[in-house]
Structure formats: structure tokens, C-alpha cells
């Protein structure tokens, strides 16, 4: 029985210790403490919710300042260092809050600029105490000692380099979003870029251009009189160029690389008719100095058709008319090098 009471008292002692720790964190011993700043920040954000206009912005600004001050105070009381550096973990947390406060917007709280400048701001926050000596009530500026200067320079320079690498990542990510055809390039020999996804064997937008262009060309050629089709082929550069610009405007409007694609035709006369090659030519940056292009070939042949005879007693033989028949390849082919010259 005594053992049972001891166990119960032990459990109550654990809850009492937890309660005391929570009470110590939540209830400040003096009004001038980091808890006061945190409570002021929460109060400011609650009040800003009910305010409007510039008053709400001013109250929210005060809330951010109170939060940054309270966090910095709490994390520097007994600082935990980042391994291998003299940077306190509190400076990293405070730097993140400052970066979010300075570079966030209404649409996105965390932006690319927030992430990029976070390490540099944290390093500057770490370096600030080295330029101040004295207590909170009696302090003055000073020049850091030579050994402290060296540590500050190394820390700030290292964090700036990290910021540069983060910015490099966001720049590449933006390029790949605006120029997705770059994903078809081979980055195997690159020192900086590592692709996690499987490399595209053929540029997607180049395929989209030819696949959208094919039905437009077929509509203007299929079952048209052969003489009219031959005139169309003589003007193929103008006709296909107009259709190509229409395809680019309708399907690649959201990409910056739209201006780097060029659509051209190549007409080849063969024994049975004509071969129309539709080319989507990439003029943007590529590992191949001569560039590359995609081709979709369409065979155009004349086909004789007999007009429908509306008179039943006519003995005059009907003249057969030739119309165009067009058949295009199902797949697009990728070719390295410059596009073939026009004939």
C-alpha cells in the first residue's frame, strides 16, 4: 500500500514539475522580459484583425517588431550554437522572422527572396553584438578585436555564398519554368546542375507545335483540287508561317520561350506527288552549337475522283478530277544540327 502511495506521489511530482516549467515560460518574473514582447505581438495581431486601412497595417507592423524582439531575446539568453560556428540558433530563427517580415507579401508569406536573404540576415544579426559592449542600460559601440573580425568576415562571407547558391537555384527553376525545352538538354557534364527527373528525349513544346500544326495544314489541303494545292505549296512559306504563328500564340503564350521557336516548311517533289516537311526549329540556347529541330513529314498525292452524275440518261463520260490526299507521320523526329535549306 505504501508503495502505491509513493508511485502516486511520484506521478503528481512529475505533473508539478511540468506545470512549474510551463508557468515559468508563460508567466514572466518581471514586466521587462521576452514574454512581454511575445504577448504584445499576439495582442497586436488580434487587434489588427478588427482594424481597417492603414491602422491595421501599423498595428500588424508593431506585432512583427514585438515578435522579432521577443524571439531574439529568448534565444540569446542561453544561446545554442550552430555546430561548427559561433552563430546562435536564435540568430537563425530571428533572421528568418526578419526576412519574412521584410520580403513577404499578401499573396505569399514565404517568397524566394525570403529564403535567399535568410542566411545573410542571420549572419548580420550574429555579428551585431560584436560591435556593442556593456550592459543593456549602459552600452556603447566598439570595434571588434582582430580575432573576432576574422570570424565575422568568414561567417558573413559564408552565409552570403549560401545566399548566392540559393539564388542560383531559384534562377534555374524560373528558367526551366519559362523555357521548359531546356529540360531536353543533357546536364551530365554540368558542375552545378543535377537533374533528379528522367531527361526528356524530345522537347515537349516542339512536339506540341507540330501536333497542333498538323490538323490546320490538313484542313487546308485535304480533298482540295490538285491545282489549288500546288499553288498552296508554292506559297508554303507564307501559309505555314501564318499557321505556325497562330499555333505559337494559342499554345505557348504562357512560356517565354515562345519567341525562340520558329516554324518553317520544306517542300520536296517526288514521283507520286509532294512531301511537305513541317519543321519546328529551336533557336534558343543548347549544348549543340548548331541547334536542333523537329520534323513531321506529310505525303501529298493527287487522287482521282468521279463527280456525282445528276442526270440518269446522260451518255457523256464524266471527267475525273484530281484532289489532294495528305497523310502525315504519327511521330515527330528530332534532328541535331541546322535545318535543311529551302529548295
UniProtKB/Swiss-Prot annotation:
InterPro entries: Uncharacterised_alr2393. This is Uncharacterized protein alr2393. It comes from Nostoc sp. (strain PCC 7120 / SAG 25.82 / UTEX 2576).
